[in-house]
């Protein structure tokens, strides 16, 4: 049963990556009795909400597609506002109140890392579609990602600039207050 749920979570996360432009309201569908609850955490409001809304909509679309083929899952998502403390509080609500069996999210690296550590302690399967910090999956064997890491992206950009564009030097402009920007710049 756990492997089947993990397969659904992985499929939903992969479809989320392909469908991030779809629109929906981002709320949970609790209308199906007996449905297996899959949790979601994403910044649905705030500065990075564009990423959370897109990912959340893709996950909901994937769950809907899976259910259209005879399965019975429900997606319960909460807005963590791009904040690690909010993410932990929402995660605890998903586990305690909503009784989720797996988690898709978080979307950005700081909240994702905080939740990953707790999910590992709780033996909760978790996958992030977009959390790129290396430390996320180092939280444990229950934590997965469906995207490239910061170092990989930075190295690929540097390789492209050097090998394809012929650049011998580069000036890197980055935001020192943003972990994603720092991670890419350091690897470049």
Q: Residue locations for each model-derived region?
A:
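Amphipathic, non-transmembrane alpha-helical secondary structure
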Residues: 60, 85-96, 113, 155-163, ...
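Short, low-complexity disordered leader/linker segments with a strong preference
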Residues: 1-37, 67-69, 121
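An alpha-beta-alpha
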Residues: 143-188
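Glycine-rich, charge-decorated loop segments at or immediately adjacent to ligand/cofactor-binding or catalytic sites
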Residues: 137-141
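Short beta-strand segments enriched in small/hydrophobic residues
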Residues: 34-56, 106, 169-175
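Beta-alpha junction/loop-to-helix N-cap segments that form part of ligand/metal-binding clefts
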Residues: 26-30, 51-55, 65-136, 146
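Short, solvent-exposed amphipathic alpha-helices that sit
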Residues: 51-66, 86, 126, 153-156, ...
């Amino acid at each position: 049963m756990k492997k089947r749920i993990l397969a659904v979570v992985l499929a939903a996360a992969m479809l989320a990556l392909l469908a991030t432009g779809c629109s929906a309201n981002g709320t949970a569908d609790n209308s199906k009795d007996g449905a297996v609850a899959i949790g979601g955490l994403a910044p649905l409001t705030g500065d990075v909400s564009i990423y959370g809304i897109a990912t959340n909509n893709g996950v909901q679309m994937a769950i809907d597609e899976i259910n259209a083929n005879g399965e019975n899952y429900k997606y319960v998502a909460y807005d963590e506002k791009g904040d690690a403390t909010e993410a932990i509080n929402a995660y605890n609500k998903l586990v305690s109140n909503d009784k989720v069996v797996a988690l898709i999210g978080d979307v950005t690296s700081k909240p994702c890392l905080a939740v990953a550590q707790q999910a590992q302690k709780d033996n909760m399967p978790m996958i992030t579609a977009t959390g790129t910090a290396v430390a996320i999956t180092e939280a444990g064997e229950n934590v997965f990602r469906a995207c490239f890491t910061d170092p990989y992206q930075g190295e690929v950009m540097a390789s492209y600039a050097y090998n394809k564009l012929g650049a011998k030097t580069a000036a890197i402009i980055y935001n020192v207050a943003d972990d994603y920007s720092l991670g890419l710049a350091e690897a470049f």
